[in-house]
C-alpha cells in the first residue's frame, strides 16, 4: 500500500479523532473544530451518490487545499540550493506543477477510502508547530501517522490559520521522500527536465 494512498485514507477518516491537551487549549480546540468540520464535509461528499467521480474528486480537492501549504511543501521538497537557482517565474511554475501533482495524487486515491480505526496517541507543540500523532489499525498491523502543522506569522489568503506542511507515515516523511526523489533526479538532469517530467505526470 503506497504512502499517499494511506495518507488520503487517513485524511478522509480522521473525523473520528479528538484532540486532548491542557496547553494552548483554546487555539488547539479551534484547530480541532475546523479540521474536523472540513473532514466531515469530505465524508459527505464521498457519500453523495449524485456526484460523478470527477465532480466528487474536484470537490474533495477544493476542501483539502486550504488545509495545506502546498507552496511551502514545493519549496522544501526541491531544497534551498536548487530553489535559489530558479527565477521567480520558474519558482511559480515549479510550485504550480508540484501542487497539481499532489492534488492528482490525492484524487486518484479517493476510491480506496475505507473505515479504518484511528486513535490519537499524542500531541506535541513547539512554538508555532503542532505534531498530531495518530495510530491507524489496518488488517495487517497498526501504523503510526504524524500530521505536522505550522502557524504562519501572517494568515495566507484563502488558507486556514494552521496549515499542514508534512505528514509522516510509519516514520517516513512525504516531504522528505519527495526531496530525496527530486535530489536524485537532479544529480544527472536539469531543473527544466524535472519540471517537464512533472508536467508529463499531469497528463498521465
What are the residue ranges of the model-derived segments?
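Twin-arginine (Tat) signal peptide motif
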Residues: 1-10
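Bacterial N-terminal signal peptides
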Residues: 9-20
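Sec/Tat signal peptide C-region and signal peptidase I cleavage site
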Residues: 19-27
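Early exported N-terminus immediately downstream of N-terminal targeting peptides
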Residues: 28-109
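Surface-exposed, charged secondary-structure patches
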Residues: 104-146, 204
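Low-complexity, intrinsically disordered terminal/linker segments enriched in charged
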Residues: 166-204
Amino acid at each position: 500500500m503506497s504512502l499517499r494512498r494511506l495518507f488520503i485514507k487517513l485524511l478522509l477518516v480522521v473525523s473520528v479523532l479528538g484532540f486532548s491537551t491542557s496547553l494552548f487549549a483554546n487555539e488547539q480546540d479551534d484547530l480541532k473544530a475546523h479540521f474536523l468540520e472540513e473532514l466531515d464535509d469530505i465524508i459527505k461528499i464521498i457519500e453523495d451518490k449524485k456526484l460523478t467521480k470527477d465532480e466528487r474528486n474536484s470537490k474533495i480537492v477544493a476542501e483539502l487545499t486550504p488545509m495545506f501549504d502546498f507552496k511551502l511543501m514545493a519549496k522544501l521538497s526541491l531544497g534551498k540550493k536548487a530553489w535559489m537557482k530558479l527565477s521567480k517565474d520558474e519558482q511559480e511554475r515549479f510550485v504550480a506543477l508540484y501542487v497539481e501533482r499532489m492534488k492528482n495524487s490525492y484524487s486518484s486515491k479517493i476510491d480506496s477510502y475505507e473505515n479504518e480505526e484511528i486513535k490519537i496517541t499524542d500531541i506535541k507543540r513547539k512554538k508555532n508547530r503542532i505534531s498530531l500523532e495518530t495510530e491507524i489499525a489496518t488488517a495487517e498491523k497498526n501504523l503510526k501517522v504524524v500530521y505536522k502543522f505550522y502557524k504562519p506569522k501572517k494568515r495566507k489568503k484563502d488558507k486556514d490559520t494552521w496549515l499542514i506542511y508534512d505528514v509522516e507515515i510509519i516514520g517516513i516523511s512525504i516531504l522528505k521522500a519527495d526531496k530525496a526523489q527530486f535530489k536524485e533526479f537532479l544529480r544527472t538532469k536539469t531543473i527544466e527536465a524535472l519540471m517537464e517530467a512533472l508536467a508529463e505526470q499531469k497528463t498521465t
